């Protein structure tokens, strides 16, 4: 439902990422049984992808760019060609503010050879990339993996703040802290590809 955040949990190999891929219209191989409905309507895969954003488990950032440059690059790729540069800049600044990235907007992202932004900031930049298109539903695969408990809490708090816009958020999450877990509205637990538990 709109304005709610759902945690998707289960052991490795239980089908969490596969389920996210199906829901986001990203699954292109294998048989899919059943239907994916959006607000009670069946949509074509392309329409579904236009309404959703997806954040992969592993960072997909270009280390040589600054945070703002990375977001502008993504805006150039994802937004319609008719979108003016000024409008793209407004969107980029908006997601920078939403995710608390103002302090590192002009910092180089970095890589193994070049120091850059922190792990928590990198996760929030990945979330910002998905928000450029203003999706109504945001799917995230393990957004807190590789982070210490403090950074993981910050990332989940950033996601929770996005609910105020009526967005729906679904994320796979492994061993969340009690503080992070308390921010989720609903929990789905998968086991061997089947729903073992679903509820608030």
PLM region descriptions:
Residues 1, 24, 32-42, 48-50, ...:
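Conserved ABC transporter NBD signature motif
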Residues 6, 17-29:
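Short, conserved post-Walker A segment of ABC-type ATPase nucleotide-binding domains
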Residues 9-12:
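The feature captures the beta-strand-to-loop junction immediately N-terminal to the Walker
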Residues 54, 58, 63-80, 91:
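Q-loop/switch helix immediately C-terminal to the Walker
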Residues 72, 76, 87-108:
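Conserved ABC ATPase "signature" region
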Residues 130-131:
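ABC ATPase C-loop
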Residues 138-142:
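Catalytic Walker B motif of ABC-type/P-loop ATPase nucleotide-binding domains
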Residues 152-165:
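Helical segment within the ABC ATPase nucleotide-binding domain
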């Amino acid at each position: 439902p709109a304005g709610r955040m759902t945690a998707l949990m289960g052991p490795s190999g239980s089908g969490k990422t596969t389920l996210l891929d199906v829901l986001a219209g990203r699954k292109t191989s294998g048989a899919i049984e059943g239907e994916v409905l959006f607000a009670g309507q069946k949509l074509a895969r392309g329409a579904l992808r236009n309404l959703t954003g997806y954040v992969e488990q592993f960072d997909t950032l270009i280390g040589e760019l600054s945070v703002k440059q990375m977001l502008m690059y993504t805006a150039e790729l994802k937004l319609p060609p008719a979108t003016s540069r000024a409008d793209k800049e407004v969107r980029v600044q908006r997601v920078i503010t939403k995710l608390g990235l103002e302090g590192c907007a002009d910092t180089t992202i970095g890589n193994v050879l070049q120091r850059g932004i922190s792990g928590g900031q990198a996760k929030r930049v990945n979330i910002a990339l998905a928000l450029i298109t203003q999706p109504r539903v945001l799917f995230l695969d393990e957004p807190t993996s590789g982070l210490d408990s403090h950074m993981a809490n910050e990332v989940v708090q950033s996601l929770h703040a996005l609910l105020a816009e009526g967005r729906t958020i679904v994320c796979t999450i492994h061993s969340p802290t009690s503080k992070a877990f308390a921010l989720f509205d609903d929990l789905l637990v998968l086991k061997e590809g089947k729903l073992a538990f679903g509820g608030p």
